Every structure is written in structure tokens, then in C-alpha cells.
């Protein structure tokens, strides 16, 4: 289902994720290796194969996460597939409802995590959200549980929301994300 690129990560959390990133040729080569790896162990379902890429462009296998990840929204935006629904259907024994030849990567998507953190120390910051406004509009998606008046508990993951944008090109997606983040309060 394509690839995502984590451009900023902090404390094992992906802060900024985007896709697609690779050329069609590299995507096909890496994709065939991923499929072969899943087939070799008999895995059927959703998973993220993670790789590190060096300055020469060579990939090194890191790990497989056999689950839907926080940044699955990038893949959903560029493929049009609802990965959570597919994962549930596969787990229920329905099989994978996608033919690999039908998968088309369209446009560019970026996801940004919005965290409840102290802006100076970046430590988690529990407390009340006195005001909360999420962006909206064409090509903008927000996944969140937070709202005005929400009390963020002290024992929590600092994730408040994921702001995801889609546009036909990466430069347009960057502009759309800047606008969406400027709307966020």
C-alpha cells in the first residue's frame, strides 16, 4: 500500500509522517521484498515493515509492526482505503479485500501529531483545554478525542490529535498543512 516517510521523530513517537516518498521503481522493488517477507512467514493482515535508509539510498530492515499504526492515515489518504475497516474484516476471517494490482498511489499526504506538551521542555502537560478548535476543509482530516473543556489526565499519552492533509503534490500538501496548523487552537 505504498510507503510513508518519518521525517521527524522524538521519544519514539513519529511527529511528522508523509507519503509517498520513493520513486515508482524503488517502491516496486521494496514492495516486492515486503510481500515476500510476509509470505515467507505466512502472515496475512495489516502490517508496517520499517526500514532505515542510508545516505547511499540503501535500505536496511528494522522491524515489522503487525498492526495498524498511528500514522496509517497517510496511507489511507494516498490510497483511498480504510485500513481499520480492512484490518477488522481480515481479522474476522474475510480475507484481504484488495487486489495488489488495484492499489494506486494518488497525491501526497502529511500527518502531524498535536501533543499536550510544555513548549519549553516538551514534557507531557496535563490539564484543561480551555479552548480547542481543529482545522477543516477540503483535503483536511483531524482524528481527535479532545474538545474545549477536555481534561487531559496526568497518566496519558500526550497525543491530542492527528492533523492530516492531502493534496495532489507535496508542495501543495505542505501549504495545506501550514494553513491547517495556523487554524489549530
Task: Name what the model sees in each region.
Residues 1-185:
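ATP-dependent carboxylate activation and anion-phosphoryl transfer catalytic cores
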